[in-house]
Amino acid sequence: MIITTTGCHSRQEPKVDITPHHINLQADSFYQQAMTLMESSYDVDSTRKCIRFLDKALAIDSLNPDYYGIKAKLLSEMGELDSALHVQTLAMKKKAITGEYLFQLGLLQAAKDMYTEAHESFGQSRAFLQAVLKQYPDSLGAFILAEAANALYEKEDSLFMRDIDEIRKRFPERLMEIEMTRRVKPHSLVN
């Protein structure tokens, strides 16, 4: 007599760690210089100088997601999508990435027609951001990004808000932001 057993396998969300990265003060001083310059000047030379500051920060602390994310943002703003994609891909390989930056990586991948990789990044972003929302349910920024990641993961071009009345109750002081954001088409972020 042969007895076979089958187990129930439930689909579990991937385990994500949203513990904030420990700040290295020496690296952070370069990051803060980059941020100050980035906020005060928008020319190409200043942007390049910001990137050099971020490179110095990364040389000291190669696991801080913000250093990679801001560097990728600056590179993409300069039209250097391949370089931005390389930076965020490296961050992902080092596990120096957050839900926000996984979303950024997905956008960069989609812009380079890497749709399978983008789909995976949006799914990972969604999982990270849902974990953030469990711990910080009042974070509108994480909520909006999670909904955008979900829309792009599900290949929809409608930004969230299935129950708009409930969302308005959840964020009563942010109604203008909600109304402006819900009109964004997630696929327009890729093009």
What are the language-model segments listed below?
Residues 11-15, 137-191:
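Terminal, low-structured helical/coil segments at or just beyond the last alpha-helical repeat
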Residues 23-60, 70:
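Alpha-helical segment of the N-proximal tetratricopeptide repeat
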Residues 28, 66, 100, 140-142:
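Start-of-helix register in tetratricopeptide repeats
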Residues 35, 39, 73, 107, ...:
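Residue-level recognition of tetratricopeptide repeat
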Residues 39-43, 77, 111-112, 151-153, ...:
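Register position in tetratricopeptide repeats
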Residues 55-59, 89-93, 126-127, 133-134, ...:
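Conserved structural position within tetratricopeptide repeats
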